[in-house]
Amino acid sequence: MIDSLDLVIDTVLAREVLDSRGNPTVEAEVLLEGGAIGRAIVPSGASTGAYEAHELRDAGDRYFGKGVLKVVENIEERIAPTICGLSASDQATIDGVMSELDGTENKSKLGANAILAVSIATARSAANGYGMPLYRYLGGPMASLLPVPLMNVINGGAHAANNLDFQEFMLVPHGANTFREALRMGAEVFHTLKQLLSEKGLSTAVGDEGGFAPNLQSNQAAGDLLVKSIEKAGFIPGEQISLALDVASTEFFKDGAYFFGGRNYSTEGMIEELVKLVNAYPIVSIEDGLAEDDWEGWGLLTKELGEKVQLVGDDLFVTNTSRLQRGINQKVANSILIKVNQIGSLTETLQAIDLANRSGYTSVISHRSGETEDTTIADLSVATRAGQIKTGSLSRSERVAKYNQLLRIEDELGSEATYAGSNDLGPLCGKK
């Protein structure tokens, strides 16, 4: 039996650490009266939506302005005195107290990175206090669904120094029976792709998220390479492994037009290009197919493709319930990308997932391009039964760490574990 006093927050500490790009980020530690401790490190994005919560940086010369000593100070001198003495098991109260202390809509006073680090560290400390894994603490007895990984094996856009306009070209091994099998399938295609790139004399250097970053003639060339890699690895495209795209179109949207492939496209022209891709390749998911403020265009895109593929809002929704509700009301998209640092607290993240579930939208739990060894999103994907996770390619330890955590969870669950697979993507698989 847990003594409630053991769950009371005693100490909150913070430190400046580095992310996978060598940039500073913040780690928080929450120590409870009973001795349990929770740690969390927050990630950082490269292609960030205009409506994301504010990531606080120091400015100045140190780390070229990217230091987070101000964030550390805010945690230890402002947040800590406010939440010490509260129970770590009362997540919503603690997150609410921090948001109130900040007092801004986008958490710009204390920094979303400060609030999120403490929020997740609090949840981890409570889980450890109860002696249970994080996915079980957050998700309860129903937390047993392992997600389909959307594996970013070709990087472009803001994630790589190459000539590809689209940001991510992903493998979706929905035809597997277990997560372990899905991971193997993805890894085998990844290595086959590397071999094909080498044979063509193309670069096998990797981008921020561990995928290859070759200079290819077009986005279609990337699709062709992935289909060939799937087949050469011994799998059936569209049946065992499909494709997903993160277009990240806000990055090349300017003055009302989309510029990629050397020419400008209207919204209607952009939609036409996406339709061509869906008809030509086994694509089951498209993220940010249009820009974050092109609401009218998103409505047209959803009418055109919403019954055929998963249309994911990332920059469009930024894990924000207000923007998601607008999308629901306007029948825009059918899925939300969940990035904990876009909204800045665990409670608000869970609220966004809940709203999506209640509204018939899917949720895709996601990493950021600037990641760390923190594996919270792996547990979160199982806790919420989201059914899908984006955590990069099959290389770079900060990406693989999440996959390995999911393997541990699957082993721990044993016969209770189920793999989302084609069932979770549902009619989106093979609905062409």
From Swiss-Prot:
Positions that bind (2R)-2-phosphoglycerate: 167, 339, 368-369, 390
GO molecular function annotations of the record: magnesium ion binding; phosphopyruvate hydratase activity
Cellular localization per UniProt: Cytoplasm; Secreted; Cell surface
UniProt keyword annotation of Magnesium present: yes
Documented EC number(s): 4.2.1.11
GO biological process: glycolytic process
Protein name: Enolase
Organism this protein belongs to: Prochlorococcus marinus (strain MIT 9211)
Organism taxonomic ancestry: Bacteria, Bacillati, Cyanobacteriota, Cyanophyceae, Synechococcales
